[in-house]
Design a protein with these regions (language model features):
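Juxtamembrane intracellular "pre-TM" segments in multi-pass secondary transporters
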Residues: 2-10, 257-294, 320, 486-487
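Extracytoplasmic gate region of multi-pass secondary transporters
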Residues: 34-38, 289-344, 403, 437-438
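Cytoplasmic membrane-interface "Motif A"-like loop-to-helix N-cap segments
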Residues: 76-87, 352-366
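C-terminal ends and interior cores of transmembrane alpha-helices
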Residues: 88-117, 367-381
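Cytoplasmic helix-loop-helix junction between adjacent transmembrane helices
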Residues: 127-166
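C-terminal transmembrane helical hairpin of 12-TM major facilitator-type secondary transporters
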Residues: 356-406
Length: 487
């Protein structure tokens, strides 16, 4: 490239990274908002957590399959328009979510009662499945875009920066939905019928509280009846703005803005190859590539540990270590913040010291996970809460390295022509982990106690460590390098 081309390329490279970060964070706005509506739906309609739990487990599996399907599509489509399609549909679905009670009232002719609630649950279940099918249009096209704009030797560092979009999106939507649930809705504290309904629907929650806390909980729900609707409508509106932002900001490949393609990313394919040649390339680089399947298995174990801490950490700290719900809740925030730090450092180390061989960084990270989860488990019940949180925080620091880098390794080995398909395979396998981390650990905790939850978690981390260790000497990417490049 000429000096002018290099300057333009850097501009478009960072424009693509930042644009996809913002775009993907907005996908989180219309995906992670549902959990904030659950307390309102429970109070107003009595929908149980068990019902929500079954739906959310199914949704996690659907999302994993969607990442695979959209990964295959992303390698053959324009990344910008792929994202636009997915986010547009998700914004419409979220608007329908907010109108769910109105739609069910129109269908059933009722505003409450068994038939109405069953209809509402079915509607929400269908919408959640559809929403997560189109949520799969988020990461795969982002991955395609970035692998076309970032050289393999820089991908670990810059993809680690990009991966912060997950936490940024989750952080902002938590603040936004928390505000909406506390400042919108209709005040119905003076309606005795609604009060009786809320008292009955929240009985399983308030029975564990003292009288003053129970009254405050019920009163808060009555002051914000219908607030849950705004946790869908406002993110849906933001998603519409996000669609416009993506259209204006992103372009598909360097060639689309008059720039040459990345050096050092030569493959057996070019843009004129036939469909049959592309399928053969996918078979070689993805479906029959033991490296991709090894990474998928490793990511399965990584996700088990990550989701176990996020889903069960606060509960364990309250039940087994006697922490308050407020203190236990900080575990998720601290885990995420330290995870971002670990993710950025892991990416930099991979490129700086291991020449892009990110699997070596992952090995050290998994060793850290094993060490600090084991230390956390071994601490006595009398341990200071700050020490407990520090142990989990350091575990988060280490676990987010592999969580980000496994996708980078898959992209480099499948090459930019099949990166999204490879990440789709890895993502699909990793999301099967929700069965173990969700239902599995819940079952183990109920029947065998927390001790065996942690023993199982540590065993999963060890297996992930061994799988990644077996890849130690694997080359850094799957591109066809000239002799001059490899010397």
């Amino acid at each position: 490239m000429t000096a002018e081309q290099t300057k333009r390329f850097k501009y478009w490279q960072w424009r693509t990274i930042i644009g996809t970060m913002i775009g993907y964070a907005i996908f989180y706005f219309v995906r992670k908002n549902f959990s904030f509506a659950i307390p309102g739906l429970t109070a107003e309609y009595g929908i149980s957590k068990t019902t929500f739990g079954v739906i959310m487990t199914l949704v996690g599996l659907i999302y994993g399959v969607s990442k695979f399907v959209n990964g295959v599509l992303a390698d053959r489509t324009n990344g910008r328009w792929h994202m636009v399609t997915g986010l547009s549909v998700c914004s419409v679905i979220n608007f329908i979510f907010g109108c769910g009670a109105i739609i069910c009232a129109w269908i059933t002719g009722q505003t409450y009662g068994t038939t109405f609630i069953h209809t509402l649950v079915v509607l929400f279940g269908v919408l959640l499945i559809l929403n997560n099918m189109f949520q799969g249009c988020g990461f795969p096209p982002c991955n395609r875009l970035i692998t076309h704009w970032v050289p393999p030797k820089e991908l670990a560092t810059k993809m680690s920066i990009w991966n912060a979009s997950h936490s940024i999106g989750a952080f902002i939507i938590a603040i936004l939905c928390g505000y909406l649930m506390g400042h919108t809705g209709t005040d119905m504290t003076g309606d005795p019928e609604m009060r009786q309904r809320v008292v009955e629907n929240t009985a399983s929650i308030t029975e564990k509280m003292n009288a003053a806390s129970a009254e405050a909980y019920v009163t808060n729900a009555l002051q914000h009846v219908g607030a849950w609707q705004w946790t869908f409508w406002v993110p849906a509106a933001i998603a519409v703005l996000g669609v416009i932002f993506i259209i204006v900001t992103l372009r598909d490949t360097p060639k689309s803005v008059g720039l040459p393609e990345l050096e050092g990313t030569k493959t057996q394919l070019d843009e004129h190859d036939s469909s049959e040649e592309f399928k053969a390339f996918l078979r070689k680089k993805v479906f029959l590539n033991p490296m991709i399947w090894g990474l998928a298995v490793a990511d399965f174990f990584v996700y088990i540990v990550r989701f176990a801490v996020l889903d069960w950490g606060p509960t364990f700290l309250q039940e087994s270590r006697g922490l308050s719900s407020s203190m236990a809740g900080w575990t998720v925030a601290i885990f995420e913040v330290c995870g971002i730090t670990g993710m950025l450092l892991a990416g930099w180390i991979s490129d700086k010291f291991f020449g892009g061989r990110a699997q070596r960084t992952c090995v050290f990270c998994m060793a850290g996970v094993i060490l600090f989860i084991s230390l956390f488990f071994a601490l006595p019940e009398s341990t200071d809460p700050v020490v407990l949180l520090m142990m989990l925080a350091v575990a988060g620091f280490f676990i987010y390295g592999p969580q980000a880098l496994i996708g980078v390794i898959a992209s480099n080995h499948a090459t930019k022509k099949a990166a999204s398909t490879a990440n789709g395979v890895v993502g699909m396998v990793s999301y099967v982990s929700v069965v173990v981390s969700g239902w599995g650990f819940g079952f183990i905790s109920d029947h065998f106690g927390w001790r065996w939850v942690f023993i199982t978690m540590i065993a999963m981390a060890v297996l992930g460590f061994l799988v990644l260790l077996s890849m130690w000497n694997t080359k850094s990417d799957g591109y066809e390098h000239d002799a001059a490049e490899t010397n």
